[in-house]
Regions:
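Short, surface-exposed alpha-helical recognition segments that flank or form part
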Residues: 1-3, 38, 100, 104, ...
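N-terminal helical cap/lid subdomain that shapes the substrate entry/recognition surface
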Residues: 17-26, 31-110, 118, 129
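A generic secondary-structure micro-motif detector
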Residues: 37, 66-67, 121, 153-154, ...
Length: 234
């Protein structure tokens, strides 16, 4: 069989319940690598340092402001943009300037994603340059058609409904034939409400609450294993 660019040279035997899926959408952080890597811990420290520089506050006070922005504006970035007119590109480049030596390739996951039939997209609250660094570090730099990042969302991050609507519109997706995987259960209800099939990556980064449990169609602690199982290769 002749291979088509972006598709495997054969079509795996997909589980009947998921045979209708033609677009696979993945969150990035703590979804395509283990939550134990704790990249966000490094990013969080840089966010606090950035807030301290902008506000002139001591680190402990800056941390409190950072978290208040998150609660009141949805993200630290949105708070800084509203209160100080911060350039989002400058902020994101600064806070994402972290080492990624804790990341490594999961060959099983890389191979499983390569075998998935259909389109494959990244949907992240980070920015594209950071996402590309992560993907390169875990062996997935050539695995996805595109990255829908925080700039493309017009700074309305998941779980804001506008984030999902912008993704659907940008790639002309049919929600009823798309699946979205995320490690944060709170990010799944908006996707479910729009008709997407949902997969919760239960890796310890968040425990599911009653307000999210209804929106979980599938659940796994090992994405590579789950993909192998639904394609009949496990």
């Amino acid at each position: 069989m002749v291979a088509v660019a972006g598709r495997p040279a054969y079509q795996p035997a997909m589980h009947p319940a998921l045979a209708h899926i033609v677009c696979w959408i993945f969150d990035l952080d703590n979804t395509l690598y283990p939550a134990s890597a704790d990249l966000f811990g490094l990013i969080d420290k840089r966010m606090t340092a950035y807030v301290a520089r902008i506000t002139g506050l001591a680190p402990d006070q800056a941390y409190q402001v950072q978290k208040s922005y998150f609660r009141e504006h949805g993200t630290t970035l949105n708070g800084l943009m509203a209160e100080y007119g911060v350039d989002p590109h400058d902020f994101l480049a600064d806070v994402h300037a972290i080492e990624m030596d804790v990341l490594e390739e999961d060959k099983r996951l890389v191979d499983a994603i390569a075998r998935l039939p259909g389109r494959k997209l990244i949907f992240t609250n980070g920015d594209e340059p950071y996402a590309r660094r992560v993907l390169a570090s875990v062996g997935l730099s050539e695995s996805f058609e595109a990255i829908h990042d925080i700039h493309a969302m017009a700074y309305n991050p998941k779980p804001h409904p506008l984030a999902y609507q912008s993704m659907i519109q940008a790639f002309r997706l049919d929600p009823s034939r798309s699946l979205f995987a995320d490690d944060l259960a709170r990010n799944l209800p908006p996707a479910k409400a729009l008709g997407l099939t949902t997969l919760w990556i239960d890796n310890g980064s968040e425990q599911v609450g009653e307000d999210s449990s209804h929106a979980i169609d599938y659940r796994t602690g090992d994405l590579g294993q789950w993909l192998d199982e639904i394609m009949g290769t496990e």
